[in-house]
From Swiss-Prot:
It comes from the Bacteria. Keywords: Ribonucleoprotein, Ribosomal protein. Belongs to the bacterial ribosomal protein bL12 family. One of its GO terms (cellular component) is cytosolic large ribosomal subunit. The lineage of its organism: Bacteria, Pseudomonadati, Pseudomonadota, Betaproteobacteria, Burkholderiales. It comes from Variovorax paradoxus (strain S110). NCBIfam families: L12. SUPFAM superfamilies: ClpS-like (SSF54736), Ribosomal protein L7/12, oligomerisation (N-terminal) domain (SSF48300). Pfam families: Ribosomal_L12, Ribosomal_L12_N. The gene is rplL. This is Large ribosomal subunit protein bL12.
């Protein structure tokens, strides 16, 4: 029995979603396959989408070292965080330590620049 592919596609095109669902179930039973297995190759393409979704949106400003001029680093920490003198001094002396967490990239870069200008070593994580 010759079967025309175009006629088959036309028949599929005219089916409702419910009829298509029944067809998929019948194919699964007839050929012993699973529609979920068919989705696995598409999951590989989803891996690329997941990599894009993993792009970092929140950054933590980590003070690694206060540098030679600890006073300037303390002033910069106070400006960035709004901490008092004692709290800022304790934070600088406890390096490596997070100065600020959950910042946007622009805010994190600005804080990093301010700390580096004060002579501190800083990392964004």
């Amino acid at each position: 029995m010759a079967f025309d592919k175009d006629a088959f596609l036309t028949a599929l095109d005219s089916m409702t979603v419910l009829e298509l669902n029944d067809l998929v179930k019948a194919i699964e039973e007839k050929f012993g396959v699973s529609a979920a297995a068919m989705a696995a190759p598409a999951g590989a393409g989803g891996g690329a989408a997941a990599a894009v979704a993993e792009e970092q949106t929140e950054f933590n400003v980590m003070l690694m070292d206060a540098g030679a001029n600890k006073v300037s680093a303390i002033k910069a920490v106070r400006e960035i965080t709004g901490l008092g003198l004692k709290e800022a001094k304790d934070l600088v002396e406890a390096a490596p330590k997070a100065v600020k967490e959950g910042l946007s990239k622009a805010d994190a870069e600005a804080a990093k620049k301010k700390l580096e200008d004060a002579g501190a070593k800083v990392e964004l994580k």
